[in-house]
Amino acid sequence: TEIETREYPYGELFAHAVGYSSAGKTGVEALANFQLLRAHGNFLENGLKELAGEKKTGDSVVTTFNLRLQQIAYEALGDRRGAVAAMDPSTGKILCMVSKPAFDPNTVAENWESLIHGDTAEARLLNRVTQGLYPPGSTFKILTALQYMREHPGAYKEYRFDCSGIFAYESYQIRCYHQNAHGEQDFAQAFANSCNGAFANLGLSLDLAGLKGLAEQLLFNRDLPLSLPYSKSSYQMDSGAGDWEILQTSIGQGQTLISPMHNLLIMSAIANDGVLMRPY
């Protein structure tokens, strides 16, 4: 009896993006399983193949992945745990999707036990692009800035902040990266410098219910327009938050969690004049 097996010529490179078809299905293998199995060929040709005992060839599936971008992202991550993804903001085309640590889809079946029972920190089968949740860090300052602009549409350009490298409020301190002092800054400069002190200061002035509403407009605590399995991003701060939580949340720390894919969607919507294209 002839045994058929899938071959994945790029090994780990497209492990999470393309997925695997042994021990279940993931990635494109799962999304396009029906297309890969059915045959739209000539009816007579398919009938003759069936009579001859030959297997009908399934349909082809063409992805949007860019091999060069995928290789660059894969190499840039090196041995670090993490994720890299890119999309065309104007169309929604996913151009690359890399998650590490990865695995070889050619050997999933034989290595299944070690993959699911191995070092939990490795979590090689986890697609960190869509399923990993992390503090957004300075990327959240986009939301803090946007909420401030909404609340002060005619005056946000007048904002000034003198950064000494440490922003002290009550008994709390927020430090800029390497305690770097940015000096006197306006709103745009504070954003360009990703000044922690300035954005912690901005956060204290915001309507917290409005900030939460904005976060949910940008799909925190909401379903994402994705076909792949994903983890829902989380924004917890509400109007009853204390000062420390406000300071932390305003600069992307605290309890806020986001997936790399969700972050990519937000950035793509901004790059596309506020319009989010459905990723594919």
Q: Model-predicted segments: where are they?
A:
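Short hydrophobic alpha-helical segments used for membrane anchoring or interfacial signaling
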Residues: 84-89
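Beta-lactam-recognizing serine transpeptidase/beta-lactamase-like catalytic domain environment
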Residues: 90-138, 143-280
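Extracytoplasmic/periplasmic proteins that interact with beta-lactams or build/remodel peptidoglycan
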Residues: 1-83, 97-128, 133, 280
